[in-house]
Amino acid sequence: MLDVKDIFKSIPHRYPFLLVDRILEIDGNEKVVGIKNVTINDNFFQGHFPSRPVMPGVLICEAMAQVGAIFAHNARGGMTDDRVFVLTGLNNVKFKRPVEPGDQLRMELTCLKRRGSFWKMQGIATVDGKLVAQAEISAMEVELA
């Protein structure tokens, strides 16, 4: 299990764009499970939508991608100052239910393919055991200029 201090060592994201609160499980190079506790204080709810706050789908995908980056960084020994994982693709994205304040977003990513610095993962996001989103996520480790 990784807490927020460990997450800070794994990815460069910080408030307000850090969308992972905890990693519950890392199963070697196969699978990772992380959570985001969604609160009304999340800044994206200010305009999406004031009368019925809903977490934007693209941010659900970003949260899954951040969990995937933590997974990949851990598989190779942690984050370094000169390298970062970047999102290279999203495929077969589906949104099934809204994510609202008070929900705990659970994200499970499974490694589909890994070749060199390239990763392809299947991401599934749930709330209370119900599917809210799914996507194939591709990412690549790159050197910072």
Regions found by a protein language model. Name each.
Residues 28-29, 100-103, 110-145:
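HotDog/MaoC-like acyl-thioester-processing domains
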Residues 15-55, 60:
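Catalytic strand-loop segment that frames the active site of acyl-thioester-processing enzymes
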Residues 23, 64, 109, 129:
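A residue-level signal for conserved active-site and pocket-lining positions in enzyme catalytic cores
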